[in-house]
Amino acid sequence: MKEALSILCLALLVSVSEAEVTKPNSENFIECLRYRTSSENPITDSISIADNTTTFLSSYLSYTKNKRYSSPNFKKLLAIVAAKHVSHVQATVVCAKTNGIQLRIRSGGHDLEGLSYRSSVPFVILDMFNLRSITVNVLSKKAWVQAGATLGELYVKINEASQTLAFPAGVCPTVGVGGHISGGGYGNLMRKFGITVDHVSDAQLIDVNGKLLNRASMGEDLFWAIRGGGGASFGVILSWKINLVKVPKILTVFKVNKTLEQGGTDVLYKWQLVATKFPEDLFMRAWPQIINGAERGDRTIAVVFYAQFLGPADKLLAIMNQRLPELGLRREDCHEMSWFNTTLFWADYPAGTPKSVLLDRPTNPGFFKSKSDYVKKPIPKEGLEKLWKTMFKFNNIVWMQFNPYGGVMDQIPSTATAFPHRKGNMFKVQYSTTWLAANATEISLSMMKELYKVAEPYVSSNPREAFFNYRDIDIGSNPSDETNVDEAKIYGYKYFLGNLKRLMQVKAKYDPENFFKNEQSIPPVRVIE
């Protein structure tokens, strides 16, 4: 395709006010739901009308993870539909569209900016948590998992079927499968096997017309888009068919801390030089965080090194002694265990914790903010020290995670799926802060922006890349009721790089009126050569 492209926008500014739809009416919406569902699968009990009652607030808060958005906007939120059947999802899509009501789709509630459960225009929430069935086929090494299941539930089901099968996904067990996979979720198996979207072979999706589609009926372009491009811009993900991977019976993990006083900065600098060049069986995360110092009232930074190796401890020790002796890894630091038990380790549960804990769905929201970056070359020691200096300014919990690339991630083309961040990245950074009281929100958000600014010289640029699953409204957004294409390109190129153009084309083909939208959704644009 030539560099000079003429871009025909289906709508340079697509807004609710411009669409020829009826004025939002909750009563009409509810009646539509009842009309479009059968008595065999009644929807009435799945509907919670928005009101200031304990019952409704409990429904809203049960999957609201960020307390910054724990107070629903009753002037805009009309209802929550906790779908229990596919027909409930279909009816919700059709009835919301017919009545001019915006739809927000919530799986596990871990959307970091709360875009799956808030809007500034009249909307309904489609909760997916009841749709959580999982079927594992050991012979084919495949599984079907519904969007409302959590990673913890998926890992338990896999473990019940096999001791040597796994799925390369994240380490937080309460994350919902629907959004995690569609945004390109990653975990400690990524250097060996890639990320979630590299292991999806089929999907079920409800489109803008309420039709149930699979890979064959949706077509390869839409199937490509929902693997890494975020499913909520294109439809409602019902389920994923995933390919499981073979892992050894014995894996080894360790957790070693190095404070600044123990040479943590030097070890982290060396980590940057070797982490992407380790054998692909080894994943080693670096996690700088503020901790209490040796003296009362003192604070320091500890770089916590978490690692997982697909093999026994002796082989891991040999690698570490050769590649990163500065860490000083000892045999007693290493713990051999099954893949399933590593999921408990990474979730920070103590040894011996029953696996049933991964089935829990705790409702303990907190105040937090996260941002992300991709790093292409080592951050110099003076750069690390500037980051430490900024972290010390925080009065609340703050940390960064450095997640190494390399291995298989260097071998998968950036266009294989909609997830583009592949070869050329040394590691991905997540910045996070949490706080206890609402009155600390403003200063906490301001400090995160300062930390992000300090990191700017040391990370990717033009664009400054970002990870879609670490949603960050600061990098660009649209109002709830419109999608300005120029604004969408700002955040879109950061999340999707060169894949954005194809994503916009797919959006224009399957959702030309832009029904499935939020503040950071894909706009419908046809690109004509």
Swiss-Prot record:
InterPro entries: BBE, FAD-bd_PCMH, FAD-bd_PCMH-like_sf, FAD-bd_PCMH_sub1, FAD-bd_PCMH_sub2, Oxid_FAD_bind_N. Binds 1 FAD per subunit in a bicovalent manner. Disulfide bonds join 32-95. Its EC number is 1.1.1.-, 1.-.-.-. It comes from the Eukaryota. GO terms for molecular function: FAD binding; oxidoreductase activity. Its cofactor is FAD. Glycans are attached at residues 52, 257, 341, 439. Residues 1-19 form the signal peptide. Its main location: secreted. Residues 69-247 form the FAD-binding PCMH-type domain. There is a cross-link at residues 110-172 (6-(S-cysteinyl)-8alpha-(pros-histidyl)-FAD (His-Cys)). Belongs to the oxygen-dependent FAD-linked oxidoreductase family. This is Berberine bridge enzyme-like 7. It comes from Arabidopsis thaliana. The lineage of its organism: Eukaryota, Viridiplantae, Streptophyta, Embryophyta, Tracheophyta.
